């Protein structure tokens, strides 16, 4: 019986040791899992920060693209009629010269009066859209930004670099030159 008791004690002792070893292994595994979980949480946090950073970059890109598109749309609205205006200005300038031709024929004077009214309406439409004549005159200073010299004249009786005569007026669309004024310049 003593043997049996000792055997039971030993069995209990072995069982306790096995339980203790198993408990220690579980605790160790639990620590390992906690470390793995902490590492994964750090990775998740790092990924979330990277996602937020990338989102902020994309939002900035979208804002910049929107701003650029709005600026381009504004430019198109502001200067979009340039080609049409260029095509219309030359015939209108010719019509102005025809209208300025003196005549004694009353019927022709009536037509010329009607053409002057049409020219005036077209010029008003141009001005409404930011297109206007430069109003270059003889005696103005020549500026290659606005004027195109068709001819340089010596002994014109004017100072050098002054406009002697205007062949055709120039036009601006808002702050840009649409058509340069064609002029004769004193040397």
Curated annotation (Swiss-Prot):
Its main location: cytoplasm. The gene is grpE. PROSITE patterns: GRPE. Homodimer. This is Protein GrpE. Belongs to the GrpE family. Participates actively in the response to hyperosmotic and heat shock by preventing the aggregation of stress-denatured proteins, in association with DnaK and GrpE. It is the nucleotide exchange factor for DnaK and may function as a thermosensor. Unfolded proteins bind initially to DnaJ; upon interaction with the DnaJ-bound protein, DnaK hydrolyzes its bound ATP, resulting in the formation of a stable complex. GrpE releases ADP from DnaK; ATP binding to DnaK triggers the release of the substrate protein, thus completing the reaction cycle. SUPFAM superfamilies: Coiled-coil domain of nucleotide exchange factor GrpE, Head domain of nucleotide exchange factor GrpE. GO terms for molecular function: adenyl-nucleotide exchange factor activity; protein homodimerization activity; protein-folding chaperone binding; unfolded protein binding. Keywords: Chaperone, Cytoplasm, Stress response. GO terms for biological process: protein folding. It is found in: Cytoplasm. Residues 1-23 are annotated as: Disordered. One of its GO terms (cellular component) is cytoplasm.
